[in-house]
């Protein structure tokens, strides 16, 4: 059985969130939480919150044991971009793209064998 958690339109660039997501993909959830606690990236606490939500969903909705869960899917998609402008010299302006992410984590029980 699979349990899923999604955080949509999170204010972190997908490129930066993917760096952290690559560290935990395929790991056991306990190990993944430890990795996220020790990773000094802005995306770490956000991804940790989504992971804990997926674990809670697995325990509550499907009555799975948290100790036997593995991260089967972990990916970051691009959300809507907030377009802003930075004033420059001589009346010009430069575009600033504030990117957002959709973070998805799927956990399931570890296969025996």
Swiss-Prot record:
Keywords: Ribonucleoprotein, Ribosomal protein, RNA-binding, rRNA-binding. Belongs to the universal ribosomal protein uL22 family. InterPro entries: Ribosomal_uL22, Ribosomal_uL22_bac/chlpt-type, Ribosomal_uL22_bac/org-type, Ribosomal_uL22_CS, Ribosomal_uL22_sf. PROSITE patterns: RIBOSOMAL_L22. One of its GO terms (molecular function) is structural constituent of ribosome. Part of the 50S ribosomal subunit. It comes from Bacillus pumilus (strain SAFR-032). This is Large ribosomal subunit protein uL22. The lineage of its organism: Bacteria, Bacillati, Bacillota, Bacilli, Bacillales. This protein binds specifically to 23S rRNA; its binding is stimulated by other ribosomal proteins, e.g. L4, L17, and L20. It is important during the early stages of 50S assembly. It makes multiple contacts with different domains of the 23S rRNA in the assembled 50S subunit and ribosome. The globular domain of the protein is located near the polypeptide exit tunnel on the outside of the subunit, while an extended beta-hairpin is found that lines the wall of the exit tunnel in the center of the 70S ribosome. GO terms for biological process: translation. GO terms for cellular component: cytosolic large ribosomal subunit.
């Amino acid at each position: 059985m699979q349990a899923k958690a999604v955080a949509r339109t999170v204010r972190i660039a997908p490129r930066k969130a993917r760096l952290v997501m690559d560290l935990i993909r395929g790991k056991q959830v306990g190990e993944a939480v430890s990795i996220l606690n020790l990773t000094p990236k802005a995306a770490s606490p956000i991804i940790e919150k989504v992971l804990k939500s997926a674990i809670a969903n697995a325990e509550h909705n499907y009555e799975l044991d948290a100790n036997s869960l593995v991260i089967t899917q972990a990916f970051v998609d691009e959300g809507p971009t907030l377009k802003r402008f930075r004033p420059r010299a001589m009346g010009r302006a430069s575009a600033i793209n504030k990117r957002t992410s959709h973070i998805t984590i799927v956990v399931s029980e570890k296969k025996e064998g």
